[in-house]
Every structure is written in C-alpha cells, then in structure tokens.
UniProtKB/Swiss-Prot annotation, chain A:
Keywords: Acetylation, Cytokinin signaling pathway, Cytoplasm, Nucleus, Phosphoprotein, Stress response, Two-component regulatory system. InterPro entries: AHP1-5/YPD1, HPT_dom_sf, Sig_transdc_His_kin_Hpt_dom. GO terms for cellular component: cytoplasm; cytosol; nucleus; plastid. The modification Phosphohistidine is found at H82. GO terms for molecular function: histidine phosphotransfer kinase activity; protein histidine kinase binding. Residues 40-147 form the HPt domain. Two-component system major event consists of a His-to-Asp phosphorelay between a sensor histidine kinase (HK) and a response regulator (RR). In plants, the His-to-Asp phosphorelay involves an additional intermediate named Histidine-containing phosphotransfer protein (HPt). This multistep phosphorelay consists of a His-Asp-His-Asp sequential transfer of a phosphate group between first a His and an Asp of the HK protein, followed by the transfer to a conserved His of the HPt protein and finally the transfer to an Asp in the receiver domain of the RR protein. Pfam families: Hpt. The gene is AHP3. This is Histidine-containing phosphotransfer protein 3.
From Swiss-Prot, chain B:
Residues 1000-1014 have a biased composition (Low complexity). Interacts with AHP2, depending of the phosphorylation state of Asp-1075 in the receiver domain, but probably not with AHP1 and AHP3. The keyword Transit peptide does not apply. This is Histidine kinase 1. Mostly expressed in roots, and, to a lower extent, in stems, leaves and flowers. Residues 103-446 are extracellular. One of its GO terms (biological process) is stomatal complex patterning. It comes from Arabidopsis thaliana (Mouse-ear cress). Residues 1-20, 964-987, 1000-1021 are annotated as: Disordered.
Length: 155, 1207
C-alpha cells in the first residue's frame, strides 16, 4: 500500500513538474495551491473549474464574434480576450495567457486571420490544459483515496 | 553595301536630332523608373510609425522589394550605359560613312563628267581632223575632176597628137596648180582612158615633188570608146609592162622642172587610181599604203566624164596622208596621257597616238595592220578587250570605265564614225590613274582618316559616357547604399520600437518575479535557522537580485521615458535630505575608492520642493555612481544652488559672462522661462542648478554630447573595466528634460568631468522654509580636522559665512598644535607666537579666536586623522581626552570603523559621532547639540562622561536618518542598491521625516530614550515592510487585514474567487460583485446622501460644531466598506466609470472610500488614468499578495500607520 502511495506521489510530482516545465502552468498556480487549506479543500479545483467555464464561454463568444465575416466586432473580441487573459493569468495557465497576449495584439491590429488562428490555438491549448489538469486532479484523488498525502511540489 | 548604308543614311540623316531626342527620352524613362522605385518607398517612410509596427511582416517584404528594385536599377544603369555607347557607335559610324561617301561620290561624279567630256573631246578632235582631211581630199578631188572635165571638154575629141599633147599639157598645168595649192596632198593622179597617166607626188621623206607620167607613144589618140571602160584595170597601169614610166623632179614651189625625166621601174610607182576604183561612177575612198610613207594613205577616186556625160574619160585620184591625224593625236595624248587610235571598220589601224608603225612589212610590201596586232601593248590589249567584250556587234558608242588591262585600270571609249563610204572607229584608252588617280588616292586617305577619327571619337565618347554616367551610377550606388541604410535604420527603429513595446508590456512580468525573489530572500534572511554560510550566500543572492532589479528598472525606465509613458509625480519632498542621503550612501562606496564625496548645497536652496523625489534621486544617483566609476582619487562634489525664476532675468546678463560655455543653454532657458512665466505666473517655480564635479579621467570633449545617448560610453573599453550598460546618462538626460531642465558636460579646469544641470521645480507655498539657525551669537569655535581637503574647505567656508570661527587642520600634528595653542592658553598665554610652523593666515585666525570671549570649542575630528593602523590611536585619544572638558569633540566615523574604536570613543565619553561625509545638515546637528549641551551646564557634562561606558549607547552611534533602514544591517553596497531600489519604486507613501541625525548624549541618558528606541525597532521593521512592499511579510502578517471590509468588483469569476480567498485568508471580509454598477449600488451612497441632509435639517437648531461631528460619525458608520478593489475592465460599467460615479456621489460628503484599481496593464499611463478618475492606488494582475496587503493597509489605516512611524 505504501509503495502504491509512494508511486502515486512520485507520479504526481513528476506530472506536476512536467506541467510547469512544459509551460502549461506558472507560479500563480502554486500561489493558488497555497491558498487551499482545510477551510477550502477544493479551492483549486473550484477555481480551475470556474476558469474553464469562463474559458468556454469567452471562447465561444469570440468564435461567434469572429464568425460574422464582414463586420467583426474586434472590440468585443478584445474585451473577451482581455478577460480571458486576466483569468488565465490568475489561474496560472501560462500558455493560454501567452496566446491571449498574441490574440490581443492581433485583435488590436484588426488582423482577422491572426485572430482566428490564435483563437483556434487558444481553444486547443485550453482543452489540453483541461485534460492535463483533469489528470492531475485524478491523481490527487487517487492519492487521497489511497490514504496518502498530497506531496508538496517545489518548482 | 554602299547602297545600303546610303539608304540608311538618307533615312537617318534628317532623323538624327530626333534620334538623340529619342535617346534622351529613353534615358529619362529609365530614370523615371528608378525614381519610381524609390518614391513609393519614400512615401512609405513618411507613413505613421504605428502602421509600421503593425505591419512589420509586410514591410519586410517591401524592404526586399525595394532592394531588388535597387539591384535591377543598378543593372538598368549598366544597360543604359551600354545603349548609349551603341547609339554613339552607330551615330559615329553613320557619320563616317556619309562623310566618306559624299566627299567621294560628288568628286567622283563631277570628275567622271569632266572625264567623259574630256574623252569625248579627245576623240572628237582627231575625228574632226580626219573629217576635215577627208573633206579636203574630197573637195580637191572634185575640183580636179571639174577642171579635168573642163579641159577635156575644151579639147574634145582630139584628133591630133599635138592636140592631145596640148591637152595633156593643159591638164598638167591645171593639176599642178591644184596640187601646189593643196600642200597636204600626197599625190594627184589622172588616169586617162587611153592609159596615159599623169601624176604629181610629194615624197615627204626627201621633201621633193615629182611629176610622173607614162610614155605617150603607145597611146592612140582616139582611144577606146566608152564601151572599153571595162577594159580598164589596174593591170593596165602596173601590169602594163610595156609602158615606160618617167619621173621628173619639180620645184615644189614653182613647178619648174628640175631635171630630166627619169625612167622609173613600175615597182616604185605610187598608187594610181584606176577605173576599177570608180565602178559606179561615184567617188570612192580607200585606205592605201605606199612604200614611201610609213602611215596609211587616204585616197579618193572620181571619174571624169566627157562632155556628153556618158563615158568616163579619165579617173582622178587624190591621195592624202593620214599622218597629220596621228600628229594631232600625239599632241593631244601628250597633254592628257593615254592612247587614241582610229581604225577602219574592219579594224585596220588608221592612226594612233603612238609612234609605233601602222604598217607591217610583208613580202607584198607594206600592208595595213589590225589594231589587235599593234605593237603598242595598250592599244593591242584595248582592242582585244573591245573585241572580246562586244565581238562583231560593236555598238556605235562605247564608254567603258574601269577596264582592267594588265594591272592598270583604263577608261575605254569608242566612237563609230560613219563617214561617206569610209566608216571609221575611234578609240580612246586613258588610264584611270590620270583622271581618277588623285581622287582615288584622296578617297582612300579620307577613308583612313575618317575611320581613325571616328574610332577616336567613339572611344572618347565612351569615356565621356562612362565619366558622365559615372555620376549617375555613383548616385545609384549611393542611393542603394542609402536605401540599405534607411532599411537598416527602419529595422533598427522597428526593433527598438518592438523593444520599447515589449519592455513596456513586460514591465510587470519582469518586475513581479524579481520582487518576489527579493521578498522571498528577505524572508529567508530573517529566518533564524540559517547557518552563517547560508546566510552569506543568501545575502549575496539578494545583492545580485537587487542589482538585477536595478538593471531591469533602468531599462524599463528608459523604455518608459522613450515611449513617453513616464509620468512624473508631483509631491513635496525635502530636497536636501534626499541629496544628503544619497551622498551618505555613495560616500561609503567612495571611501572604499579613496575618493571624497562632498555635498555643497547653498543655503538658499529650498528645503521643500514639489516634484518626483524618486526620479530626482535617480538622476543624481546615476551621475554620482558614474563619477565614482571613473574617479580613483580625488573628490566628487555635488553642488547645488538656486535661482528664483523671477529674479533670473537680472542675473542673466552677469551669469552669461561668467559662464561662457553655459551661455547657449542659458538662452534656451530664457525662452523656456519666458514660456513658463506666461503659463504659470503665480506658481512658485525655482530653477535649481546642480553640478556633479569629479576628478576622474574626464570625457573627451568630442563625446560630450554623445555620452547622453543610450548604450553610449565615452570609451568603449570602460565596459570592460567598469561595467555598466551605458544607460545611466541617457536616463538622466531624459529625466532632466522631463523635469524641464537640461544637462550638459561643461569645461572644467583640471582633471575630471563637470556635469551641470538645471531643473525647474515648484516649491510649496509655505513661506520661510529655510530658517537658518544663527550660531554666531554663541561664540563657537570649530576646529575641523579632516584630511579630505575639499570637504574641509567647503565646510569651513560655510561655517565662516555663518560667523563661526573655524580652524582647519589636515593631520594629527597640525591638530595637536592648534589644540595646544587654543586650549592651553591658560598656561602658555602667547605660546602660539613662538610656533614657527604655523602659517600666517592660520596664525591670524588663531589670534582672532583668542579674542572671542568665552568661546565654545568644537573639535570635529576625522577618525582617519588618528593612526588606526597601529595602537598609537589610543594614546592619541588619551591626549585629546585631556581637553574634553574644554572642548566638545565630534567624531567623523567611517562606515567601516571598527567596533573597538567606537567602544573606546564611547568609553571616553565622546558620544557625538557622525558617519562621514560631513555636510551642512550634520554640521548643524553637531552645533545644535553642542549649544544645547552647553545650556545644560557643566555638571551634566561630567555625568555624561561617567555613563559613557553604558552599552545602551550602541544604538546611537549611527545617525538614524531615514537611510539607516538601508545601511543599518546591510553592507555598503546593498545600501546603495537599496537606495536606488527605493527611489525607483513608485512610492505612494512618503517617508516620514526623521529629523534627528544625531542623538544627543544628554537625551540618551534618560530612560525614556532607551524605551523609545526599543519601541522604534519594530516600527522600523514595520516601515521597512511597507517600503519594500514586496518583501518580508512573515507569519504574523498573515492576518494583517483582520476586520477590514472589502468590496471586490471583478467580473472574471476566476479572479474574483482567487482574490476573495486571498483576502479572506488574511482576515478581511470580502463582498464580491460582478460589475461596476453593482459596486456603486452596493455602496448605497444615494441613501446616505439623502439621509445626510435630513439629519442636517433635524439638527439645524443644534450647535453647528455638534452637527458636523454627528454627520461625520454617522457617515463613517454608514459606509459599509473600508476599501474597494475595482477591476478596470468590466461589463456594464467599467472600473473608471464606477469610480467616477462613486466620487461624484461623495461630493458634498466628507467621505472618501479608498479605491484600488485592478488592471492587467502595467504601464504608468494606466496608473495615471486610474489616479485621474479618483482611485487611490493601483494593483496589477495577477495579484501579488504582499503588494496587495501593503497597499490595502496603507490605505485603510493611514492614521495608525503614520502615527506609528512619526514618533
């Protein structure tokens, strides 16, 4: 049992580190984790879920706005992406944030092609992140179920 | 070939100006194209820069496009050059051909015409002669015939011999008359029917004349009838052997007989025309030969008819030599050259222009020769050519040019003359050389000359074209170069722009992690369980981090200033204090370098000015650190003085004269000032002048301007030796300009650099800022014993100016001497007179001091004056201690002065210790302390000495200015870095001014002092926390927001959640709303406002003072939140709008709820916008916990915060 936990814990550590290394997450996520304690045990998961909901909403908003060929409301896209940038930076979704910055630039320069391209990337990126985080949480749960402690990962 | 060129020339000749114009047009076109390639690009250049940035990729394409254009235009120059050359070649070729052609053709044609005439003439004349010869002959013959007829008619039918003889005699006379009259005649013969022949003959060889007749005896008188005509023949003459011929010589003139008739053989007879020659009774012509003549003879024969005109009675023959024709030809040819000959139709030569024989001797005597057999080669070949060319069907007229006979060319002309019964052909053969020789030669020469000339011209032309187009190609090259340069420049600009943009965008991202690193390090440092080694390492890391942060800040500042986003603060600050702190800080560094740092501020400098203190300090920090870098020995002086803007005009004229190099700047300043005066007359603007003067290596005058450019260093090698990025001075200049001033390197006497700058700062309205304490009345005597001469001089000057007697000493010996002189006056009254090593001015000074009644001696001793290397210093101290009751000692310590020295000093009761450098404010502190001390009396003094050993003084030794937070626990360098660090940080809080530089010993004696000091420590700690808000927030601050009610307006759910949790963790009560509208609503100001007036009405009767307080309290209580965190971008109502609405609602109330902006942008412009709409502070996303806490705390508990600090 202990070996299983240790294995799980090691996997968890590796996975987390890989997430940081691959640039999916940054320190903000660590900050987020620090905020999680006994009073709010599922804080991270909660925030992340919020983030993904937000993401979905904003991305679909932007996609809709960009769909209207001819008179694309770049302002609308801009404000959406601004929000997305804010929330992604708060969660520590580094890649999404970086893409947001690019998308914002495209938006500012009214570069339709760029916007569409970036948006697709954002979509892909956020889905990847979602999957990764899902895995992470699953691992966490497994560890908890096995009776282990979530290890502190130092980046 | 020639025809071609001719036609071409005909076409081109009138065209040629057109052609050149065309060429010009072509060239123009090419140039137009080139300029076209350049111009669109040029117009691009003027396009707004923003567009450039946005269309980076597109522009790159354009660059390539432009450069390819440039290349092709370069080729086109080459092509144009080639084209021009080809054109030139064609032109010159045409010109040459034409010239040659025309000169030749016209000459040739005219000559040919002339030659034709000449030839014609040449031929005509012999022919005419021939003609005339023929005519003469014919006429003579006719005349002879007529005469004969007449005579014969007269002696018609002679019957007798006598009659016959008579008739013959008559005939002879008549004939002679005719013969004699016509000298050209060769012979006249009359052949009678009966066979009798009479003839006259001239022999040109012997030039004698003969009469030839036949024997009459055999002839019958009656003769034969006409029917016998047929019986006549030549045989009867020649063959008639029976006849006897006589020849009688005559006198050629008179015709007298010169001798007897001689018998001659018939072979010697001349031709005698017979009846056979006139078979049809008509005149007939013959060409005959005679053995007496070497030329052919022309003989005509005519019959003589009898009276009845029915029968021929005689035949008259006239023979003429053609000799004269040949003579004429010879004459003609002699003049003109060439050959002429006449032939009969059959081709027998009649006459030639040569001397060659015309007859050939055959066995039958001389015979006529054919022209083709002529001995003259030219005639022979000419005749052969004619025969060969034309054969038998020769046309009447032949003109042949350029007939090649042998190796020469000839003209051959032939005429056919159809004379009566004697057709003649005349041929002229003239060598071409005679007529065209010169022309041909000249044409050849002309051609040669023309060709060589045109080749020369072509080459010269090519060279000219090359030279002329060289300019163009050079220009093209230059243009290409220019394009490249501009291209590069634009790239550079674009990249620089990107850089600025990038940096501006990255500012937050860069600074936050650095702040975090430093903060974490601070936490680590404050941790107790670190080993020494670890501690050292961590400290080192912290140093490095701060250095990195400083560098980052430099770069960011620069980019901010460059992108025009830097906003200067407008806040009051104590200028002197800032600069003193700065000098304190740098002096530490300077002492290490053995360089003296001196601050020399004039007394009229305003104490408080309005401006951006951080930026100001940054300016001087940069300048001084720069100076330190390059100064190894000597001093660095920071001078400052001030000019009032209004009084400046009067001073201007003077100052311009005084400072020549500064003059242009002054005039600029005047303009600037005029402008300023107009715009803000009542604003209390000051012009503050500063100089940073060092004794370093100096800057080359040529680099005085360029050192202020970014990444520019006076000497590139300095990067290696001194490090640095070259950004410092650039930032300085930008900041100075931003503050309305200017900076310049100024000429200075001696080594080093002198930077002079002025700033325009406004001073607060509070009047009388600088009250200078009046020390003169206390009778103070200050003895400055410092070995830094500059600082000493400046300080003493200042002291003297304020009426304080000052004595200077530079080393220990001097000090002891002066002390002895001054303080031991009691025992040795006039001892200083005997001192011989005191200089005169000093002596005068000393004598002045002695006259002061009841003087208070203050001896300022630099610790460096003592010999610290050995233990002598203790003795020196003991020596000085002897005078401690007579004078007050103030010690100037170095930052690295060892604790033993300090302890010793303290033990001895010397408690006035200041850190170097000594400047005005410190001096004032010392003096004030002394004066205060003096008032307390001597007994205190003694007590003070007794307690000197108390360890509680430890904390006093370093002047607790606001800078001690930096310098207290860190090493020298860290303090410097921290200083800069702080100065860069946008500090909304202002440092509470701690006025005491020096804690006086008397106050430190009290118990309360120690208590206050212990109290002070946590305060300082707290202060430090707030100052470096990113730093050190340890566990005890975890719940630092306890009890604070916060309204969070944030639309992003994630952020809202995170912020809420964050704040709640720290003990705050958070209410989250989704947009600005909700935020405004939840504040519910309206109801409060509505409430307030009613309350006011109610309490109208009450006292006004009461009323106000009630309302205030009620308002304060009614406000549901202590603070609002406001996101800037929100749906419905954004943060700015919401803030405006809240502030509007607050108008008329005393309420001011702090609003903190949350924004994802990190530029000062955003900050400015936030502050403009009425927000109090500004935080960037993602939220930094510590920063947020410190900001919230500073806003929510300002009173507590300040009270805790300003104790």
């Amino acid at each position: 049992m202990d070996t299983l936990i240790a294995q799980l814990q090691r996997r968890f550590c590796d996975f987390t580190i890989s997430l940081y290394h691959q640039g999916f997450l940054d320190d903000q996520f660590t900050e987020l984790k620090k905020l999680q304690d006994e009073c709010s045990p599922d804080f991270v998961a909660e925030v992340v879920t919020l983030f993904f909901e937000d993401c979905e909403k904003l991305i679909s908003n932007m996609a809709r706005a960009l769909d209207q060929t001819g008179n694309v409301d770049f302002k609308l896209v801009g404000s959406s992406v601004h929000q997305l940038k804010g929330s992604s930076s708060s969660v520590g979704a580094k890649r999404v944030k970086g893409l947001c910055v690019t998308l914002k630039e495209c938006c500012d320069s009214q570069n339709y092609e760029g916007c569409v391209r970036c948006l697709q990337q954002v979509d892909i990126e956020y889905k990847t992140l979602k999957a990764k985080l899902q895995d992470l949480f699953n691992l966490e749960q497994q560890i908890v179920q096995a009776g282990g402690r979530i290890p502190q990962v130092d980046i | 070939m020639r025809g071609d060129s001719f036609s071409m020339s005909i076409e081109n000749l009138p065209d040629s100006p057109m052609g050149s114009r065309k060429k010009k047009m072509q060239i123009r076109k090419v140039f137009d194209k080139m300029t076209e390639w350049v111009t669109p690009w040029r117009s691009n250049l003027e396009s707004p820069r923003e567009m450039m940035i946005l269309r980076g990729d597109v522009e790159q394409d354009e660059f390539q496009y432009a450069s390819s254009h440039c290349l092709s235009s370069y080729y086109s120059v080459f092509v144009v050059r080639l084209a021009i050359m080809v054109m030139l070649a064609i032109l010159i070729g045409l010109l040459t051909v034409l010239t040659w052609h025309f000169t030749r053709i016209y000459t040739k044609q005219s000559l040919q015409t002339l030659a034709y005439g000449l030839r014609y003439e040449l031929l005509q004349r012999p022919v005419l002669r021939m003609w005339s010869v023929l005519n003469t002959t014919s006429e003579l013959t006719t005349a002879q015939v007529k005469l004969s007829e007449y005579v014969i008619k007269k002696y018609d039918k002679p019957t007798t011999q006598e009659e016959l003889v008579e008739m013959y005699q008559a005939m002879k006379d008549v004939t002679w008359a005719l013969f004699a009259s016509a000298k050209a005649l060769n012979a006249i013969t009359i052949n009678y029917r009966n066979g009798f022949v009479q003839a006259f003959h001239r022999d040109p060889a012997s030039s004698s004349t003969f009469y030839i007749f036949s024997d009459l005896k055999n002839y019958s008188i009656s003769g034969t009838g006409p029917e016998d005509v047929s019986g006549w023949n030549n045989k009867s003459i020649h063959g008639n052997m029976s006849a006897i011929w006589y020849q009688q010589q005559l006198d050629p003139v008179t015709g007298e007989n010169l001798g007897k008739p001689l018998k001659i053989p018939p072979d010697d007879l001349i031709n005698i025309a017979g009846i056979s020659q006139v078979p049809d009774g008509e005149a007939s012509w013959h060409v005959t030969v005679s053995k007496y003549m070497d030329s052919p003879l022309l003989s005509a024969a005519l019959p003589v008819f009898d009276a009845s005109n029915k029968s021929i009675v005689a035949v008259v023959g006239v023979t003429t030599a053609l000799y004269s024709v040949g003579q004429l030809m010879r004459d003609l040819v002699e003049v003109h050259g060439g050959h002429i000959y006449l032939t009969s139709q059959e081709g027998y030569l009649l006459a030639t222009s040569t001397d060659g024989p015309l007859l050939k001797n055959t066995s039958n005597g001389p015979q006529l020769m054919k022209a083709t057999d002529s001995e003259e080669w030219v005639i022979k070949s000419g005749a052969q050519w004619l025969e060969k060319t034309y054969g038998s069907k020769r046309p009447h007229v032949v003109h042949a040019e350029n007939v090649k006979l042998g190796d020469q060319r000839y003209y051959i002309d032939s005429f056919y003359l159809n004379l009566k019964r004697l057709p003649i052909v005349g041929v002229v053969i003239i060598p071409r050389k005679f007529i065209m020789g010169k022309v041909d030669e000249r044409a050849f020469k002309t051609l040669i000359i023309l060709i060589s000339a045109s080749v020369c011209i072509f080459f010269i032309g090519c060279v000219c074209i090359l030279i002329l187009t060289n300019g163009v190609s050079k220009e093209m090259k230059l243009r290409a170069e220019l394009i490249r340069q501009l291209d590069a420049r634009r790239r550079a600009e674009a990249s620089s722009n990107y850089k600025s943009q990038f940096l501006a965008n990255m500012s937050h991202e860069l600074r936050t992690p650095m702040a975090a690193v430093i903060g974490l390090l601070d936490i680590l440092i404050s941790d107790d369980c670190l080993s020494n080694e670890q501690y050292a390492t961590v400290t080192q890391i912290r140093k490095c981090s701060t250095a990195l942060l400083r560098l980052l800040n430099n770069i960011l500042d620069l980019s901010k200033v460059e992108s025009g986003k830097l906003v200067l603060e407008e806040a009051e600050f104590d200028l002197g204090r800032e600069l003193e702190g700065l000098v304190d800080m740098f002096s530490v560094q300077c002492i290490n370098h053995n360089v003296e740092t001196v601050l020399d501020l004039s007394d009229d400098m305003p104490a408080l000015v309005r401006g951006d203190s951080a930026r100001l300090v940054q300016i001087f920090a940069n300048l001084i650190s720069n100076s330190i870098k390059f100064t190894t020995t000597g001093h660095i002086i920071l001078r400052g003085w001030c000019e009032n803007i209004n009084s400046l005009h009067d001073e201007m004229s003077v100052s311009v004269d005084r400072r020549k190099p500064w003059a242009p700047m002054k005039t600029k300043q005047v303009q600037h000032r005029n402008h300023l005066q107009k715009s803000c007359k009542n604003a209390n603007k000051m012009v503050l002048w500063f100089e940073v003067d060092d004794t370093g290596c100096g800057i080359d005058p040529s680099k005085w301007d360029s050192v202020f450019e970014s990444f520019e260093q006076a000497d590139p090698s300095t990067t290696r030796t001194h490090g640095g990025t070259g950004l410092g001075l650039c930032i300085v200049r930008n900041l100075v300009n931003k503050m309305g001033g200017e900076i310049k390197v100024v000429q200075k006497n001696g080594l080093g650099t002198l930077m002079r700058l002025y700033l325009i700062l406004s001073t607060p309205d509070t009047v009388d800022q600088n009250i200078q304490p009046d020390f003169s009345k206390y009778g103070l005597v200050v003895m400055l014993s410092m070995y830094g001469s500059t600082a000493r001089m400046i300080t003493s000057k200042w002291l003297r100016k304020h009426g304080i007697a000052t004595v200077e000493a530079s080393d220990w010996n001097e000090l002891t001497q002066i002390i002895r002189d001054l303080l031991e006056t009691g025992s040795r009254d006039n001892s200083f007179d005997s001192q011989h090593n005191i200089s005169d001015p000093l002596r005068a000074e000393l004598s002045n001091i002695v006259e002061i009644k009841n003087p208070v001696f203050v001896i300022v001793v630099d610790i460096g004056v003592l010999d610290l290397t050995t233990n002598i210093w203790k003795e020196q101290l003991n020596y000085l201690d002897r005078f401690s009751n007579k004078a007050k000692f103030a010690w100037l310590l170095k930052h690295d002065t060892s604790n033993t020295v300090k302890t010793e000093l303290r033990r001895k009761g010397h408690v006035m210790m200041v850190n170097k450098p000594l400047y005005k404010a410190k001096m004032i502190q010392i003096l004030e302390a002394v004066i205060k001390n003096r008032k307390r009396g001597l007994c205190n003094d003694l007590r003070n000495r007794g307690n000197g050993s108390d360890e509680s003084h430890d904390c006093l030794e370093i002047d607790p200015t606001q800078f001690d937070t930096c310098s207290s626990d860190d090493s020298s360098e860290t303090s410097g870095e921290k200083q800069v660090d702080k100065s860069v940080k946008p500090s909304t809080l202002h440092s509470p001014v701690l006025k005491n530089y020096l804690i006086d010993a008397t106050t430190s004696n009290d118990d309360s002092t120690s208590a206050s000091m212990t109290q002070k420590n946590p305060e300082e700690e707290d202060w430090k926390d707030r100052l470096y808000s990113g730093i050190a927030l340890d566990g005890k601050n975890q719940k630092s927001l306890e009890g604070i009610r916060i309204l969070l307006a944030e639309d992003t759910p994630v952020l809202q959640r995170v912020a809420t949790i964050m704040l709640e963790k720290m003990g705050a009560t958070v209410t989250a709303v989704w947009d600005g509208q909700q935020a405004v609503d939840s504040l519910n100001y309206k109801s409060i406002n509505a409430q307030a007036p009613t309350e006011e009405h109610k309490s109208f009767e009450e006292e006004t003072a009461n009323k106000v307080t009630t309302r205030e309290t009620s308002l304060r209580n009614s406000s549901p939140y202590d603070l609002i965190l406001m996101d800037c971008q929100m749906p419905k109502m954004d943060g700015y709008e919401a803030t405006k609405a809240i502030r509007r609602a607050e108008i008329g109330t005393e309420l001011h709820i702090p609003i903190v902006a949350l924004t994802a942008h990190a530029m000062s412009s955003d900050e400015a916008k936030c502050l403009e709409v009425g927000m109090d502070a500004y935080l960037t996303k993602p939220i930094d916990r510590k920063l947020m806490v410190s900001t919230i705390l500073s806003l929510t508990k300002p009173s507590a915060f300040q009270t805790s600090l300003s104790a």
